[in-house]
Amino acid sequence: MEAEKRLFLKALKEKFEEDPKEKYTKFYTYGGWEQSVRKREFVAANEKVLAEKRQGVPLYNPDIGVPLGQRKLMPYKLSGTDSYCEGDDLHFMNNAAIQQLWDDIRRTVVVGMDTAHSVLEKRLGVEVTPETINEYMHTINHALSGGAVVQEHMVEVHPSLAWDSYARIFTGDDELAAELDSRFLIDINKLFPAEQAEALKKAIGKKTYQVSRVPSLVGRVCDGGTISRWSAMQIGMSFITAYKLCAGEAATADFSYASKHADVIQMGNALPGRRARGPNEPGGIQFGILSDVVQTTRVSDDPVEQSLEVVAAGAALYDQIWLGAYMSGGVGFTQYATAAYTDDILDDFSYYALDYVEKKYGRMGTKATMDVVEDIASEVTLYSLEQYDEYPALLEDHFGGSQRAAVAAAASGIGVCMATGNSNAGVNGWYLSQILHKEYHSRLGFYGYDLQDQCGASNSLAIRNDESAPLELRGPNYPNYAMNVGHQGEYAGIAQAAHSARGDAFAMSALIKVAFADPMLVFDFSKPRKEFARGALREFDAAGERDVILPAK
């Protein structure tokens, strides 16, 4: 790639005063933490909070610990956008869009309607028609947000606290879809390109599914395991109301079983007891599921962009929220994640990989063999590492070895997928890149960063099914993946890359792909990086706020 075309140069020139190739810089000349607009805001806010709420107990003090600002406190460019922000604005606690990304995933549950309809028709002799389905959908939209049905004298939830809660329906049956109230329909034909729509409808068949969006506030106050229970309770009550059933009817137990267990698709699997987490929590969300949650394949034909948007969503969800908070209990994982979705660095490496593949093999132009994995991963890894050698500013941007290891390996895996359409080959490209990188620099990042990479290739081809699961079926709790930051979001992007190369309508689940195409969602899953930028710039309007029940100010 010609030097002037390198995608990361614009960001480097904006971030640093020196030429990106300059080998020398200054220290302790930037004004310490006061060089940062956000740090100055934090200090001012701290003084106000101390005066009004802390009873003299200290809070924020940037002069404690390692002195901030001896180096440039650099801004970040959100990759694929023209937006710049400070690093603090990408911490999930400071970014409403990243919070909403997780809220919108956690508060979702997909429920099959056919079992309940079968109970109505076969056990109770009640006819199910498009008209009765529409009536039920009207009822569930009242109940799901906290409205009372069946019983009187019941307390209800203020609509302003639950405006983001609703239920919609989708089906692969065009005739039925045409008769349903369009307000409740997730219309596959309108939301997806024609070829994708046909593939999705074929996968779904004549079945009908409800997508429940529980209020964001419920997930925050309770947990992901609450979501299906909240949904199931309101589904049962809404069936009783819409179909005028007796609440004590024995068949209602079947509604309960279907909506809580038999016909429920959670976003995340329940985790082992030692993780202390139920379903619909980040550690149980498989990489293929996250690939289908992200919707870039609907709006862009660029396979690299499709893959990188999944990487960004995964970096925020898995690295920042799951590993950075749930698992470690700290605040320090943000910049592991941002390395993968800022400053167009991974973009540059990945487009180099695609260019190399298209010239040598053609997209989807070769079989998945170790020779192909070795060729592409070696080429892309060496290109990536050479950029760090040539541009010291790039090295300063990715100041941690594990940041560099993650993006070089991710681009290698994406490149292998572009050539083969095979996610297992792609993840082996990642593993090879890590090993090459370690040979190049003697180490990668913190001790143990490369634990999974040393055994990954043999695991991916193992006989034991817990180790050899296809990449799409793996997740944060897969053996050896549990506590190594700077991997999981990239794995999800590699899984997507294989399906992007193939032109598939979905990676793992047609149901998830359709459910998250819903334009009523608060977070736009077709452009996660743009949404993160809006959150960083404080332009994102999130759900789940409590202003209506707080004192007026």
UniProtKB/Swiss-Prot annotation:
Major localization class: cytoplasm
Alphabetical list of SUPFAM superfamilies matching this protein: Methyl-coenzyme M reductase alpha and beta chain C-terminal domain, Methyl-coenzyme M reductase subunits
Keywords: Cytoplasm, Metal-binding, Methanogenesis, Methylation, Nickel, Transferase
Gene Ontology molecular function, alphabetical: coenzyme-B sulfoethylthiotransferase activity; metal ion binding
Amino acids binding coenzyme B: 229, 260-261, 274
ATP-binding keyword on record: no
Catalysed reactions, semicolon-separated: coenzyme B + methyl-coenzyme M = methane + coenzyme M-coenzyme B heterodisulfide
One GO cellular component, as annotated: cytoplasm
Keyword Membrane in record: no
Gene3D superfamilies in the cross-refs: 3.30.70.470, Methyl-coenzyme M reductase, alpha/beta subunit, C-terminal, Methyl-coenzyme M Reductase, Chain A, domain 1
Cofactor: record remark: Binds 2 coenzyme F430 non-covalently per MCR complex. Coenzyme F430 is a yellow nickel porphinoid. Methyl-coenzyme-M reductase is activated when the enzyme-bound coenzyme F430 is reduced to the Ni(I) oxidation state.
Cellular localization per UniProt: Cytoplasm
Biological process annotations from GO: methanogenesis
Pathway the protein acts in: One-carbon metabolism; methyl-coenzyme M reduction; methane from methyl-coenzyme M: step 1/1
One Pfam assignment: MCR_alpha
Chain sites annotated for binding coenzyme M: 336, 447
Residues that hold coenzyme F430 according to the record: 151
Function: Component of the methyl-coenzyme M reductase (MCR) I that catalyzes the reductive cleavage of methyl-coenzyme M (CoM-S-CH3 or 2-(methylthio)ethanesulfonate) using coenzyme B (CoB or 7-mercaptoheptanoylthreonine phosphate) as reductant which results in the production of methane and the mixed heterodisulfide of CoB and CoM (CoM-S-S-CoB). This is the final step in methanogenesis.
Protein family membership: Belongs to the methyl-coenzyme M reductase alpha subunit family.
Assembly and interaction partners: MCR is a hexamer of two alpha, two beta, and two gamma chains, forming a dimer of heterotrimers.
Entry protein name: Methyl-coenzyme M reductase subunit alpha
Source organism per UniProt: Methanococcus vannielii
Taxonomic classification: Archaea, Methanobacteriati, Methanobacteriota, Methanomada group, Methanococci
Gene that encodes the chain: mcrA
